[in-house]
Protein backbone atom coordinates (compact mmCIF):
# COMPACT_ATOMS: atom_id res chain seq x y z
CA UNK A 1 0.00 0.00 0.00
CA UNK A 2 2.97 2.32 0.48
CA UNK A 3 6.19 2.87 -1.44
CA UNK A 4 9.56 4.01 -0.18
CA UNK A 5 12.35 5.61 -2.20
CA UNK A 6 15.45 3.39 -2.40
CA UNK A 7 18.72 5.33 -2.84
CA UNK A 8 21.44 3.49 -4.73
CA UNK A 9 24.40 5.74 -3.99
CA UNK A 10 25.09 5.99 -7.73
CA UNK A 11 24.28 8.53 -10.44
CA UNK A 12 21.10 6.89 -11.69
CA UNK A 13 18.76 9.01 -13.83
CA UNK A 14 16.27 6.24 -14.60
CA UNK A 15 15.62 2.53 -14.07
CA UNK A 16 13.90 0.49 -16.77
CA UNK A 17 14.59 -3.06 -15.56
CA UNK A 18 14.62 -5.00 -12.31
CA UNK A 19 14.79 -8.68 -11.46
CA UNK A 20 14.93 -10.47 -8.11
CA UNK A 21 16.58 -13.84 -7.60
CA UNK A 22 13.76 -16.30 -6.91
CA UNK A 23 16.18 -18.51 -4.99
CA UNK A 24 17.53 -15.65 -2.86
CA UNK A 25 15.16 -12.65 -2.66
CA UNK A 26 17.84 -10.48 -1.05
CA UNK A 27 19.75 -10.56 -4.33
CA UNK A 28 18.45 -8.26 -7.06
CA UNK A 29 19.64 -6.46 -10.17
CA UNK A 30 18.49 -3.17 -11.68
CA UNK A 31 19.15 -1.92 -15.20
CA UNK A 32 19.75 1.81 -15.46
CA UNK A 33 18.66 4.22 -18.17
CA UNK A 34 15.57 4.02 -20.34
CA UNK A 35 16.70 5.33 -23.70
CA UNK A 36 14.40 4.81 -26.63
CA UNK A 37 13.45 6.70 -29.74
CA UNK A 38 12.75 6.59 -33.44
CA UNK A 39 14.67 6.99 -36.68
CA UNK A 40 13.30 8.38 -39.93
CA UNK A 41 14.95 8.72 -43.34
CA UNK A 42 14.54 12.11 -45.00
CA UNK A 43 15.41 12.75 -48.68
CA UNK A 44 18.67 14.64 -48.99
CA UNK A 45 19.30 14.41 -45.26
CA UNK A 46 19.42 10.74 -44.37
CA UNK A 47 18.42 9.14 -41.07
CA UNK A 48 17.42 11.45 -38.23
CA UNK A 49 17.20 9.89 -34.79
CA UNK A 50 14.94 11.24 -32.05
CA UNK A 51 16.00 9.83 -28.67
CA UNK A 52 13.86 9.91 -25.54
CA UNK A 53 14.41 9.04 -21.90
CA UNK A 54 17.76 8.91 -20.13
CA UNK A 55 21.08 7.13 -20.42
CA UNK A 56 22.34 4.69 -17.82
CA UNK A 57 25.46 3.59 -15.97
CA UNK A 58 24.95 -0.14 -16.52
CA UNK A 59 23.61 -2.71 -14.05
CA UNK A 60 23.61 -2.41 -10.26
CA UNK A 61 23.24 -5.31 -7.84
CA UNK A 62 22.23 -5.62 -4.21
CA UNK A 63 22.71 -8.67 -2.00
CA UNK A 64 21.05 -7.21 1.10
CA UNK A 65 17.54 -6.52 -0.14
CA UNK A 66 18.31 -3.10 -1.59
CA UNK A 67 20.11 -1.52 1.37
CA UNK A 68 23.35 -1.14 -0.59
CA UNK A 69 24.24 -1.33 -4.28
CA UNK A 70 27.39 -2.05 -6.27
CA UNK A 71 28.12 -1.81 -9.98
CA UNK A 72 27.83 -5.09 -11.82
CA UNK A 73 27.93 -4.03 -15.49
CA UNK A 74 29.96 -0.82 -15.47
CA UNK A 75 29.06 1.88 -18.00
CA UNK A 76 29.34 5.66 -17.93
CA UNK A 77 26.66 8.15 -18.92
CA UNK A 78 28.72 9.46 -21.83
CA UNK A 79 28.56 6.01 -23.47
CA UNK A 80 24.85 6.75 -24.09
CA UNK A 81 23.51 3.27 -23.35
CA UNK A 82 20.67 1.81 -21.31
CA UNK A 83 19.41 -1.53 -20.01
CA UNK A 84 15.87 -2.42 -21.06
CA UNK A 85 15.27 -5.82 -19.41
CA UNK A 86 16.99 -8.21 -16.98
CA UNK A 87 16.19 -11.90 -16.60
CA UNK A 88 17.73 -14.23 -14.02
CA UNK A 89 17.80 -17.88 -15.08
CA UNK A 90 15.12 -19.54 -12.89
CA UNK A 91 17.13 -22.76 -12.64
CA UNK A 92 20.66 -21.31 -12.34
CA UNK A 93 20.84 -17.99 -10.51
CA UNK A 94 24.43 -17.41 -11.60
CA UNK A 95 23.18 -17.02 -15.19
CA UNK A 96 21.75 -13.55 -15.82
CA UNK A 97 20.67 -12.04 -19.13
CA UNK A 98 20.23 -8.38 -20.04
CA UNK A 99 18.60 -6.75 -23.07
CA UNK A 100 20.36 -3.43 -23.72
CA UNK A 101 20.71 -0.74 -26.36
CA UNK A 102 24.11 -2.31 -27.06
CA UNK A 103 22.75 -5.84 -27.62
CA UNK A 104 22.31 -8.85 -25.35
CA UNK A 105 24.64 -9.38 -22.40
CA UNK A 106 25.02 -12.49 -20.25
CA UNK A 107 26.74 -13.12 -16.94
CA UNK A 108 27.56 -16.70 -15.98
CA UNK A 109 29.03 -15.85 -12.57
CA UNK A 110 26.22 -14.06 -10.78
CA UNK A 111 26.98 -10.63 -12.20
CA UNK A 112 30.72 -10.48 -11.51
CA UNK A 113 31.45 -10.20 -15.24
CA UNK A 114 29.41 -9.75 -18.43
CA UNK A 115 29.81 -10.62 -22.11
CA UNK A 116 27.99 -9.20 -25.12
CA UNK A 117 26.74 -12.42 -26.74
CA UNK A 118 24.41 -10.89 -29.36
CA UNK A 119 25.52 -7.51 -30.68
CA UNK A 120 22.36 -6.54 -32.59
CA UNK A 121 21.50 -3.11 -31.20
CA UNK A 122 18.35 -2.04 -29.34
CA UNK A 123 17.37 -5.23 -27.55
CA UNK A 124 14.04 -4.30 -25.97
CA UNK A 125 12.90 -7.48 -24.22
CA UNK A 126 14.07 -10.96 -23.28
CA UNK A 127 12.37 -14.10 -21.94
CA UNK A 128 13.83 -17.41 -20.78
CA UNK A 129 11.93 -20.69 -21.15
CA UNK A 130 11.53 -21.90 -17.53
CA UNK A 131 11.51 -25.57 -18.58
CA UNK A 132 14.47 -25.35 -20.95
CA UNK A 133 16.64 -22.39 -19.98
CA UNK A 134 18.87 -22.89 -23.01
CA UNK A 135 15.95 -21.50 -25.03
CA UNK A 136 15.80 -17.72 -24.87
CA UNK A 137 13.86 -15.22 -26.99
CA UNK A 138 15.02 -11.64 -27.55
CA UNK A 139 13.23 -8.73 -29.25
CA UNK A 140 15.14 -5.99 -31.06
CA UNK A 141 13.78 -2.80 -32.62
CA UNK A 142 13.63 0.98 -32.62
CA UNK A 143 16.28 3.72 -32.91
CA UNK A 144 17.24 2.50 -36.37
CA UNK A 145 18.34 -0.95 -35.20
CA UNK A 146 19.88 -2.70 -38.19
CA UNK A 147 18.60 -6.10 -37.06
CA UNK A 148 15.08 -5.47 -35.78
CA UNK A 149 13.12 -8.65 -35.16
CA UNK A 150 12.61 -11.48 -32.70
CA UNK A 151 15.54 -13.85 -32.21
CA UNK A 152 15.78 -17.25 -30.55
CA UNK A 153 18.67 -19.22 -29.15
CA UNK A 154 18.31 -22.90 -28.31
CA UNK A 155 21.86 -23.41 -27.06
CA UNK A 156 22.11 -20.92 -24.22
CA UNK A 157 23.31 -18.02 -26.34
CA UNK A 158 25.94 -19.73 -28.48
CA UNK A 159 23.93 -19.00 -31.63
CA UNK A 160 20.87 -16.88 -32.45
CA UNK A 161 18.44 -17.06 -35.37
CA UNK A 162 15.47 -14.93 -36.34
CA UNK A 163 12.06 -16.28 -35.32
CA UNK A 164 9.98 -13.97 -37.51
CA UNK A 165 7.83 -16.41 -39.48
CA UNK A 166 4.07 -16.09 -39.53
CA UNK A 167 1.85 -19.16 -39.40
CA UNK A 168 1.19 -20.10 -43.02
CA UNK A 169 4.57 -18.82 -44.20
CA UNK A 170 6.29 -15.51 -44.78
CA UNK A 171 8.04 -13.19 -42.32
CA UNK A 172 6.46 -10.35 -40.40
CA UNK A 173 8.46 -7.15 -40.29
CA UNK A 174 8.45 -4.22 -37.90
CA UNK A 175 10.77 -1.40 -36.90
CA UNK A 176 9.30 -0.25 -33.60
CA UNK A 177 9.65 -1.54 -30.07
CA UNK A 178 8.54 -5.09 -29.24
CA UNK A 179 7.75 -6.68 -25.88
CA UNK A 180 7.40 -10.40 -25.25
CA UNK A 181 5.43 -12.62 -22.88
CA UNK A 182 5.52 -16.39 -22.40
CA UNK A 183 2.67 -18.54 -21.11
CA UNK A 184 3.57 -19.88 -17.65
CA UNK A 185 1.56 -23.05 -18.25
CA UNK A 186 2.63 -23.63 -21.87
CA UNK A 187 6.04 -22.02 -22.51
CA UNK A 188 5.78 -22.94 -26.18
CA UNK A 189 3.16 -20.17 -26.47
CA UNK A 190 4.78 -16.74 -26.77
CA UNK A 191 3.10 -13.39 -27.32
CA UNK A 192 4.67 -10.37 -29.00
CA UNK A 193 3.28 -6.84 -28.88
CA UNK A 194 4.91 -4.71 -31.55
CA UNK A 195 4.86 -0.97 -32.12
CA UNK A 196 4.79 0.21 -35.74
CA UNK A 197 4.34 3.63 -37.28
CA UNK A 198 0.91 2.53 -38.48
CA UNK A 199 -0.25 1.25 -35.10
CA UNK A 200 0.51 -1.57 -32.70
CA UNK A 201 0.39 -5.20 -33.74
CA UNK A 202 -0.01 -8.28 -31.56
CA UNK A 203 1.19 -11.76 -32.47
CA UNK A 204 1.10 -15.17 -30.84
Where are these predicted regions, by residue range?
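Extracellular glycan-interacting surfaces
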Residues: 1-204
